[in-house]
């Protein structure tokens, strides 16, 4: 996967993986043990933070629902997406597939096919939907064998190779495998706590619309950028979810958590035009 060398002042940025209050829990973890929801951030708050952090377009990829994303669907710089839980047919193995720029009919059709990864891949291919394998080396259910990963590389040319939720131990093999097989690498924060939105993102050449941005991704003109995950970020996210779940929400504490998160590196100013 060769670098596209996108000039920073000319690119368009999107955090291609983040969650709102609409997300459903998909796997037991510390949040479930503490009786916390999967996410407690309203879609409008995600949009506002993404824009403050320099994202040109915004999307929300909730687990198996587009209810949160539809609340922002009328905004011209927003596109509806979903993190689809997909199974290998007749096997106890699941993966998550990010489906971008979809509509309610696509959502329904994808849910109907979610029990068969081959059927999902055929649908997104036929519809021209940009779809990416999320966190490829995180085990959603049973571990994947090499044959599964090879097939996934064939079915989904786009992989999430930089996650703001998972660290180098899972991101590095995803990048190496994708480069060995060919294809496109993207990045997203996978933010559940509402404080790391926009700190991990995908950049393409300048796009004038969400459709053009996704067209660049489809064409391989995309670069992953930003933070990777670590224990501190996981602790911050879990605390933020818990605080948002309390009566009155995050309030000042949430603002303090968000203010401690590093900022996206600024775009350099354009060079002055010669006289």
Regions found by a protein language model. Give the residues of each.
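Generic structural signal for well-ordered alpha-helices
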Residues: 47, 66, 118-121
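Amphipathic coiled-coil/heptad-repeat helices and related helical stalk/stem segments
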Residues: 42-43, 113-117, 144-145, 170-171
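Active-site flanking residues adjacent to catalytic metal/cofactor-binding acidic residues
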Residues: 16, 61, 82, 134, ...
